[in-house]
Regions:
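A compositional/structural signature for long, glycine/proline-rich flexible linkers
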Residues: 1-400
């Protein structure tokens, strides 16, 4: 992604505006893939390796590499062998891997610098890597004027209007990786649906009544997922703190589905902590037609080694969240926001509302949608006090 997300972005729910994304799906069934990330210095970055089921199984990140990442060789579950001494081996639990990179961008003037870093981030097959190394040794890299074609995955687009399409795509995906015993047991429980990994799902095998019952079950499941927001974690001061298994869900299938709906591709808490707020200090739902203030007392800013940000979202009827269009094109406020006004005691008050506030409050205004809204506070490389619950975010206060 060459530009930061804005209100038009609808590809992934709950996007952030702090980083530029780099996204790729890796097919490891036939051969390994090499990942080379350039020296990032002190800039925040993370490349999360997620399994087919969105479990984070490995990171290339500042927290672990100190800004000087080593090359990685990512291999599938059936691959035999080892890597060269100068390459770190990453073993994936599934042949399909979602690699999602995040690189901190400090406003529009910083975009070109991040574009260069993205351009130096390489994904290569063994043959591509060997060819590049030969060309580099021969100093011919600069003469290569025709870049290799981008690989294209032969995957059909999911038809959201057809509930059976999920079975079709899902069984194809499951057929490309060996299943663990836990997932095999789940599929056995679903035997009446005739779901077989790698086999085409045939809805014609069911009667009209059976197809109707399946559609009803899918609709009920979606309602259950949307209604499971309290499953996200403990709620303190109106803020929902993530469960410890965020990003590595195990057999917590409802939590996995909830995160896929409202926070797809979430990192583990040690890499980034996501705190969600949907209610004010009196447990009333947040609505942009009201006026709110979030006040951080002096010395009580969110503790994060990398950075923190507070993002405003418009909530769709199905529970997803996206940026809201606003006259100042501001979607988040954080520790890098220029021009914030602090109190004489060092406190910070952020004003949350749809209507334009008084001029004296404009510097700290985070525009809200005209209806239901959601706040997400992100802390990248969070401090232990945030992870263990010693530090708590203050409640959002409604101004009547």
């Amino acid at each position: 992604m060459l530009f930061r997300s804005d209100h038009r972005a609808r590809a992934v729910t709950t996007p952030n505006t702090d980083t530029l994304y780099s996204s790729a799906w890796l097919d490891l069934a036939a051969e390994p893939i090499f990942l080379t990330v350039p020296d990032m210095g002190q800039r925040y970055y993370s490349f999360a390796c997620m399994s087919l089921f969105t479990d984070n199984f490995a990171y290339v990140c500042r927290r672990l590499d100190g800004g000087k990442p080593r090359p990685r060789m990512i291999v599938g579950p059936s691959w035999k062998g080892d890597s060269d001494a100068d390459v770190e081996l990453i073993r994936a639990p599934t042949n399909s891997v979602w690699l999602l990179g995040r690189i901190l961008v400090d406003g529009p003037p910083d975009l070109e610098t991040v574009w260069v870093l993205q351009g130096k981030t390489l994904l290569e097959t063994p043959d591509m890597r060997n060819e590049r190394r030969i060309l580099e040794m021969q100093e011919l890299m600069r003469q290569r004027t025709v870049p290799p074609p981008d690989p294209v995955a032969d995957w059909p687009a999911l038809n959201r209007d057809d509930p059976f399409d999920l079975f079709e795509v899902g069984m194809r995906a499951l057929g490309e990786s060996p299943l663990g015993e836990r997932d095999k047991a789940v599929l056995e429980d679903l035997a009446p649906l005739r779901l077989r990994p790698g086999r085409k799902f045939d809805q014609r095998a069911f009667s009209d009544a059976e197809r109707g019952a399946i559609k009803t079950g899918i609709a009920r499941a979606r309602d259950e997922i949307r209604g499971a927001s309290r499953q996200w974690g403990a709620i303190v001061n109106g803020w929902t703190y993530p469960k410890n298994n965020l990003g590595n869900f195990g057999d917590d299938y409802l939590y996995r589905a909830l995160v896929a709906l409202s926070g797809l591709a979430a990192l583990e808490p040690a890499e980034a902590t996501y705190l969600t707020c949907n209610t004010d200090q009196d447990h009333r739902g947040l609505d942009g037609k009201q006026r709110y203030v979030l006040r951080f007392p002096p010395g009580q800013m969110p503790p994060a080694k990398a950075f923190w940000s507070l993002t405003m979202y418009d909530v769709t009827p199905d529970g997803r969240a996206f940026f809201t269009d606003n006259p100042i094109s501001r979607y988040a406020i954080g520790d890098r926001t220029k021009g914030l006004q602090y109190g004489a005691d060092g406190s910070l008050e952020i004003h949350l509302q749809h209507e334009r506030p008084a001029e004296a409050l404009m510097a700290n205004w985070l525009p809200a949608p005209a209806g239901p809204m959601r706040l997400v506070l992100r802390a990248y490389e969070p401090a232990p006090s945030l992870l263990d619950g010693t530090y708590r975010i203050p409640a959002v206060r409604r101004i009547d």
